[in-house]
């Protein structure tokens, strides 16, 4: 506490009426990455004591919802749910609160109770942030944004890849308000993907036409995939390289027989 009293952001939070110095982290994240826009609906997971809720309400002016295992003291214009984000009952309450279309932004500044054993604490942080990501996938609108605090360590890169599998743009960012000795970092995912496929998925497809850029264009579950360096009439095994909100790019892994030799012309099948 003595260290906090000497802390610039601690004093600023007191002066400006914020419940936590962490409020300034969200302000700085938003100044840099513009994750919350005016009118956005925002859900904050692990929201107690409510510092991020206060800032989210100021930035958005729209629907703001806080979720935590603990009770959150009332904030004007903010709704709260006391519940576990891993529970289906909590997910249903969130969706009822924000609407069936989902939230524009999901935030999570939560951290596990620290034990002092760094390996254990890092693992608990990854477990918590994975729960936040899974919750976000259930409640975000297409093209929505996600911000989550993560403790750095040997599992961080794997977690970052999970976020990249679900968002078009992903950054790791450390706001100035984070203490210099802290291992925390914020992962920011923008434009949530609702495509029926993900990076690394493999399919066998027939190339029936080329797009305007000269790449092969195929439909997989109604989703357009552009395939590089193919010709009309080829049957190829592809691997998804990048996914955007409305289309994806794929590379050829193997060239198979000509499409006209296949009885399933124009079809695609998931490759194991």
Curated annotation (Swiss-Prot):
Q: What general EC class does the enzyme of this chain belong to?
A: transferase
Q: Which residues form the active site?
A: 149
Q: Which reaction does it catalyse?
A: uridine(2552) in 23S rRNA + S-adenosyl-L-methionine = 2'-O-methyluridine(2552) in 23S rRNA + S-adenosyl-L-homocysteine + H(+)
Q: A Gene Ontology MF term for this entry?
A: rRNA (uridine-2'-O-)-methyltransferase activity
| Residues annotated to bind S-adenosyl-L-methionine | 50, 52, 68, 84, 109
A Gene Ontology term for the protein's cellular component: cytoplasm
Q: Which SUPFAM superfamilies match?
A: Nucleic acid-binding proteins (SSF50249), S-adenosyl-L-methionine-dependent methyltransferases (SSF53335)
- UniProt keyword Metal-binding present: no
UniProt keywords (A-Z) are: Cytoplasm, Methyltransferase, rRNA processing, S-adenosyl-L-methionine, Transferase
What Pfam families does the annotation carry? Answer: FtsJ, TRAM
Biological process (GO) annotations?
Answer: RNA methylation
The residue ranges of the TRAM domain are 196-254
Q: Which PROSITE patterns match?
A: TRAM (PS50926)
What does the UniProt entry say about where the protein is found? Answer: Cytoplasm
What's the Enzyme Commission number for this chain? 2.1.1.166
Q: Which PANTHER family match?
A: PRE-RRNA 2'-O-RIBOSE RNA METHYLTRANSFERASE FTSJ3, RIBOSOMAL RNA METHYLTRANSFERASE
Q: Which family does it belong to?
A: Belongs to the class I-like SAM-binding methyltransferase superfamily. RNA methyltransferase RlmE family.
Its biological function?
Answer: Specifically methylates the uridine in position 2552 of 23S rRNA at the 2'-O position of the ribose in the fully assembled 50S ribosomal subunit.
What name does the UniProt record give this protein?
A: Ribosomal RNA large subunit methyltransferase E
Q: Which organism is it from?
A: Methanosarcina acetivorans (strain ATCC 35395 / DSM 2834 / JCM 12185 / C2A)
């Amino acid at each position: 506490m003595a260290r906090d009293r000497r802390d610039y952001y601690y004093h600023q939070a007191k002066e400006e009426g914020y419940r936590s110095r962490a409020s300034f982290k969200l302000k700085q994240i938003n100044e840099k990455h513009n994750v919350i826009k005016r009118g956005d609906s925002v859900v904050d997971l692990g929201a107690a004591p409510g510092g991020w809720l206060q800032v989210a309400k100021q930035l958005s002016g729209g629907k703001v919802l806080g979720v935590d295992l603990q009770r959150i003291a009332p904030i004007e214009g903010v709704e709260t749910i006391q519940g576990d984000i891993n529970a289906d009952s909590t997910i249903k309450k969130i969706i009822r609160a924000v609407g069936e279309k989902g939230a524009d932004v999901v935030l999570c500044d939560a951290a596990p109770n620290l034990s002092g054993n760094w390996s254990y604490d890092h693992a608990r942080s990854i477990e918590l942030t994975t729960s936040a990501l899974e919750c976000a996938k259930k409640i975000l609108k297409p093209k929505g944004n996600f911000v989550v605090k993560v403790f750095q360590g040997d599992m961080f890169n794997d977690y970052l890849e999970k976020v990249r599998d679900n968002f078009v743009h992903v950054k790791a960012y450390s706001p100035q308000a984070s203490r210099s000795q802290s291992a925390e970092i914020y992962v920011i995912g923008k434009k949530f993907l609702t495509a029926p496929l993900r990076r690394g998925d493999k399919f066998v497809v027939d190339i029936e036409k080329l797009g305007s850029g000269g790449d092969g264009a195929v439909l997989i579950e109604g989703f357009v995939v552009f395939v590089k360096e193919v010709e009309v009439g080829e049957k190829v095994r592809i691997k998804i390289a990048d996914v955007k909100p409305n289309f994806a790019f794929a590379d050829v892994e193997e060239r198979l027989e000509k499409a006209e030799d296949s009885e399933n012309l124009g079809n695609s099948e998931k490759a194991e």
